[in-house]
Amino acid sequence: MPILTIREVCNINHWGIGYYDVDDSGEIIVRPNPSQHNQTVSLQKLTEAVQQKHQARLPVLFCFPQILEHRLRDINRAFQTAREECGYKGGYCLVYPIKVNQHRRVIESLMSSGQPHGLEAGSKAELMAVLAHAGNRQTLIVCNGYKDREYIRFALMGEKLGHQVYLVIEKLSEIQMVLEEAEKLGIKPRLGVRARLASQGSGKWQSSGGEKSKFGLSASQVLQLVDILKQKNRLDCLQLLHFHLGSQLGNIRDVATGVHESARFYVELHKLGVNIRCFDVGGGLGVDYEGNRTQSDCSVNYSLNEYAATVVWGISQACLEHGLPHPTIITESGRGITAHHAVLVANVIGVERYKPRRLDAPSPEAPRVLHSMWETWTDISASREKRSLRSWIHEGQFDLADVHNQYNVGLLSLAQRAWAEQLYLNICHEVGELFNEKHRSHRTIIDELQERFADKLYVNFSLFQSLPDAWGIDQLFPVCPITGLNEPIARRAVLLDITCDSDGTIDHYIDGDGIAGTMPMPDYPEEEPPLLGFFMVGAYQEILGNMHNLFGDTATADVVVGEDGQFTVIDYDEGNTVADMLEYVYQDPKELMKRYREQIEHSDLPASQAMSFLKELEAGLNGYTYLEDE
């Protein structure tokens, strides 16, 4: 069996969808426009340049606004094509829900892209940001989430300022407040209703859709809303139908089922005299984190064009069957817009690697269990073709358990325990070389042994801050070295962050057509491990990241790549300092410095050392929260 390269098993050709690739030297390159082959930059060279020019300290989050612009263009183009092929006469509006990533640079990049799109807010604070960024051009704004009177007034102000603002009714109690505040401002509100469907997508976010969803109105509540609006002579205000199946839908059949059910709501509302003009299918457009085109939780079994065609066709068929007008289709595809635009580059600060050690045979007077382990070890080379490979490992496991028991009651010394543990590793390593991946029965134990002997890479980042979904919901993200991808697989590794938490590990890695518990790696010097890239982290991760162990935001570089491959860092942020993080938890850095000074003054340190300590402590407060080289 030929040895595969890192490039072949990390699936970059699939999850990268043209934005990320590998050049002839084996370095990962970024291509903001997949059709412009010369518009590329090496991630390794970019990192080195930012370190040199901006004195950047790793980890650094690289963001590519051109990818955001291209994603807008691609999604708009897919729906334009689908509408043309279906003869669909209604419009289309791609809406960006800012909860996916509320950072100013993201919203401003989208607003300046020249691509048509709207904005969505799910809270009062988000609406304040949306109204500001909408600017002087008429912008379609969807207002979701639970609302108080202030939220409602802000939305109505947006309508008065010339925007097309839809207040989506999430619960019946909101409608009275909306009508009252609209009357005070002398404005006719644009209303939407979120229908709670029976249909539900599968996956990690399935609870956000379906009958048990946190949001939306049931069928009977929708009828009550219609009755209330009729009584108030405001039925014409209800113009938008909204539903949400769940985020990151992996199966295109779930999309088709949800669109079909919601189209029935559209038909029935028209029968009740409600002139629905906008059909908001919500989120759900998934991205393929795994790169294997399946319907798993972290993949999708459809393309962008298939998604658009499924949505447009489902709505158009209902309109055709019942002779209804084609509404404007709205999608809230935040993950599809932002996921690819950001990649975190981090350095490895330490490597723990298994190294076989030559051991001497136990002394004649050593306990019997040690001799039993030694017999297993010597038996491997003498009879490897005559016995089950598993039996050697099982014998070693039984003996090692006995060693631990005897050690705990004082029958074995620490040196004897250490000898036994090392010999057991030698046994497993030697037997592991004899297993064959082609044998289905061997695969489970091969995986177990790979995890046991994988290099442990201690990476200078916080999983909780930079990849919170990997910790919280077991989300898989593409991760691989950013150099050496044309080299054969020579090692396996597991990644551990620098927090003081045993949950700070990455447990799942892309491995060709499947998912493994270890990451394929090229051979590399233990003292010079490659930099690692964590890809597709542009959706939710920056916003959900938490301050575990007071690790803060990483440095961020916004990069624009020219057609000749030259790049410009248009914005650079150094990330949080230690003082920043302490202030978040109400620790005043000035007060801390005062207390340091008091302790030093009461010490017997020489004056020169006391002054040096104070300077170092002050520099520490102003330093990066992540580990720094001297």
Curated annotation (Swiss-Prot):
Gene3D superfamilies: 1.10.287.3440, 1.20.58.930, Alanine racemase, Lyase, Ornithine Decarboxylase, Chain A, domain 1
EC id: 4.1.1.19
SUPFAM superfamilies in UniProt: Alanine racemase C-terminal domain-like (SSF50621), PLP-binding barrel (SSF51419)
Keywords on record: Decarboxylase, Lyase, Magnesium, Metal-binding, Polyamine biosynthesis, Putrescine biosynthesis, Pyridoxal phosphate, Spermidine biosynthesis
InterPro entries in alphabetical order: Ala_racemase/Decarboxylase_C, Arg_decarb_HB, Arg_decarbox_C, Arg_decrbxlase, De-COase2_CS, De-COase2_N, De-COase2_pyr-phos_BS, Orn/DAP/Arg_de-COase
NCBIfam families in the cross-refs: PRK05354.1, speA
Family label: Belongs to the Orn/Lys/Arg decarboxylase class-II family. SpeA subfamily.
Protein known as: Biosynthetic arginine decarboxylase
Organism: Neisseria meningitidis serogroup B (strain ATCC BAA-335 / MC58)
